[in-house]
């Protein structure tokens, strides 16, 4: 279905545009034009002078709407995602605080299930921990130093593609090996 949004302030890479329109089909922007002439066959939506902006990418989001991604349940993921979508996020990288490897395993299972859904907003996980310096972890509630175990993290990275970012402290034993180039890094994980 073709939708045309008119009568709004449109944010483009060149700046703000007034008196234009945005054409959308199947949830994707087809065109931004400086004309607000009606497109035949399109459903017209009047923005009533409001701002029209691209969807937001949420890259460091721990939860929302009363839900926390670290709960590692489908209910928590759905609830937090819905809260952020309501406010304009179209792409989400759930951030999971992982004081132990078991939390990562649970988060990966939920994330992989949600990523299987066509046109879903989740594009991968952002993991914080367990290889963080407790003195530098701010409000992350990491209470002990966990040396990075190559067997542990390589096994996780070899079985999933959903981890896109994994935070660690380089001063923790084993973390420099953990961040060295590997085949997994080339598949999309930022360490």
Task: Describe each PLM feature range.
Residues 1-39:
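N-terminal metal-binding scaffold of metallo-dependent hydrolase/deaminase domains
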Residues 8, 22, 27, 49, ...:
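Divalent metal-coordination and catalytic microenvironments
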Residues 62, 78-107, 121-134, 160-171:
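Divalent metal-dependent hydrolysis catalytic cores, especially in the metallo-beta-lactamase
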Residues 81, 108-112, 153:
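Generic structural signal for well-ordered alpha-helices
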Residues 133-160:
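Conserved phosphate-binding/catalytic loop of the ribokinase/pfkB sugar-kinase fold
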Residues 172-177:
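N-terminal active-site wall of soluble small-molecule enzyme domains
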Residues 178-185:
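Conserved small/polar residues in nucleotide/adenosyl-binding loops
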């Amino acid at each position: 279905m073709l939708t045309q949004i008119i009568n709004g302030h449109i944010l483009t890479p060149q700046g703000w545009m007034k008196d234009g329109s945005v054409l959308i089909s199947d949830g994707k922007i087809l065109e931004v034009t400086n004309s607000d002439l009606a497109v035949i066959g399109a459903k017209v939506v009047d923005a009533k002078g409001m701002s029209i902006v691209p969807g937001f990418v949420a890259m460091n989001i721990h939860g929302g709407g009363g839900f926390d991604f670290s709960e590692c349940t489908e209910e928590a993921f759905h609830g937090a995602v819905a809260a952020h979508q309501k406010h304009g996020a179209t792409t989400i990288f759930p951030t999971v605080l992982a004081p132990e490897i078991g939390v990562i395993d649970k988060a990966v299972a939920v994330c992989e299930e949600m990523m299987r859904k066509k046109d879903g907003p989740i594009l991968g996980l952002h993991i914080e921990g367990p290889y963080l310096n407790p003195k530098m972890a701010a409000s992350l509630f990491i209470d002990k130093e966990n040396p990075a175990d190559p067997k542990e993290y390589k096994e996780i990275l070899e079985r999933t593609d959903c981890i896109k970012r994994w935070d660690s402290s380089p001063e923790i034993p084993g973390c420099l090996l953990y961040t060295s180039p590997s085949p997994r890094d080339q598949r999309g994980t930022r360490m």
